[in-house]
Amino acid sequence: MNRQQDFIKELSAVTRRVCLYFPETIAPVEEAFLWNVSLTPEQTDEYLAQGWRHVSWYFYRNNCSKCRRCLPIRVPVDQFKPSKSQRRVLKKNMETEFKMFEPVEFALKHIKQSLSLYNRFLDVRYKKAPRDLGEYYNEYFVSPAQTLVSVLFINGKLAGNGFLDLGKTSLSTIYFAFDPQFSSFSPGTFSILKEIEWARENGLRYYYLGYYIREIGAMCYKGLIRPFELLDFKTGRWKETESNLGEDTTRNTRPKTKRGFG
């Protein structure tokens, strides 16, 4: 097993807390803080393959032995083919500009616009209090892994941006937010499609979407990015899945995506 995975495990502790996704449940969460650590691309691949997620320096992994409802999901980018509805999203966004930025470059050019967009997204989607510039920067622009920022411009305006980890063979979405006025363009779906396309063009193998949780409608869009693989924490192996989960769990959910943590 890769030494870096052992290193994260060695620094981690199991904390029992109210589950973020199922508040009626007290769940054990593996947590670690990787202060002042720089991960190599290979180490990033490894932590993703082992089911870890992170926000800034904080790494976490839901691994409840009696639950198994929070399953890491990834897409083999060479096998992905957009569905009919996803092709319609691409057609609708023919004039939408998609770019990838290094975090520093993006911050210098767009961080104030990005923060304003992010706070509108939090308010409309979740009724959450706004973040200040320092909180926003520390949460998304500081990372032990190499990070990229995916950006959408519609009619010259910043319409959405997402933060991603880049490994040697992997691209992993951390968080995506968009300006609610552009909801009709399906920016969450469009950004996923373009990020997968970028991953394929750059020779990557996997695109990680965080957790797939069958019972949470806001996460069911992940089951529509097919084919996908789910991590079995019990065996430590990724299992290929074609379409049944996506069809069964998304049929009655709203088409709008709510991309965020998880």
Q: Where is each model-derived feature located?
A:
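Active-site/acyl-donor-binding loops of N-acyltransferases
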Residues: 71-78, 206-262
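A conserved beta-strand-loop-helix scaffold within acyl/acetyltransferase catalytic domains
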Residues: 58-67, 72-184, 224
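Intrinsically disordered, low-complexity, positively biased terminal segments
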Residues: 1-85, 262
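Short, basic, helix/turn surface patches
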Residues: 80-92, 196, 232-240
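Acyl-donor binding region in acyl/amide transferases
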Residues: 16, 23-49, 54, 113, ...
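Glycine-rich loops and low-complexity Gly/Arg-rich segments
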Residues: 98-99, 128-129, 187-190, 197-200, ...
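Short linear sequence elements within intrinsically disordered, low-complexity coil regions
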Residues: 26, 123-126, 243
